[in-house]
């Protein structure tokens, strides 16, 4: 839930107007809107490059995933991995745009560990995959943008660990 929504709901629950501190928080959130949009655009515009770099890094760490019997051995499995990369990158952009990790959790993390275990996908490998995705994504951002984006990737890896 965004800062604005949180403030409004909290104030309404307490039957009051937002405090000056809460309004200051909203002001700070709105002031970062342009950079959050810039980050989301950069990640979306560079999705193919980011996914390609991340998968190369992951499969150099875990070459066994691409060998016979590995989780990305077949073309279908490999393409599913790439699809998941794009999906997680998109989740990160949702969180960045909202300025909150809640969309990431609500849309993509509830039950994710159980799902990967049920599918026989090694969860530690998924954690490595998200770390590779983070490295590749932060590489297309400037230092301020990377500082803002990094915690959203970390949130996903922590949830999977």
From Swiss-Prot:
Positions bound to (2R,3E)-phycocyanobilin: 81
Modified residues (N4-methylasparagine): 71
Presence of keyword rRNA-binding: no
GO annotation (BP), single: photosynthesis
Localisation: Cellular thylakoid membrane
Gene3D superfamilies: Phycocyanins
Disulfide bonds: none
Membrane topology of the entry: Peripheral membrane protein
Short name of any one Pfam family annotated for the protein: Phycobilisome
GO CC annotation, single: phycobilisome
Modification note: Contains one covalently linked bilin chromophore. The chromophore is added by phycocyanobilin lyase CpcUS.
This protein's UniProt keywords: Antenna complex, Bile pigment, Chromophore, Electron transport, Membrane, Methylation, Photosynthesis, Phycobilisome, Thylakoid, Transport
Job description of the protein: A variant alpha-allophycocyanin (AP) which forms a complex with beta-AP with maximum absorption at approximately 670 nanometers. It is an important phycobilisome terminal emitter involved in energy transfer to photosystem I.
PANTHER family the UniProt entry points to: ALLOPHYCOCYANIN ALPHA CHAIN, PHYCOBILISOME 32.1 KDA LINKER POLYPEPTIDE, PHYCOCYANIN-ASSOCIATED, ROD 2-RELATED
Similarity remark: Belongs to the phycobiliprotein family.
Quaternary structure note: Heterodimer of an alpha-B and a beta chain forming AP-B.
Protein name: Allophycocyanin subunit alpha-B
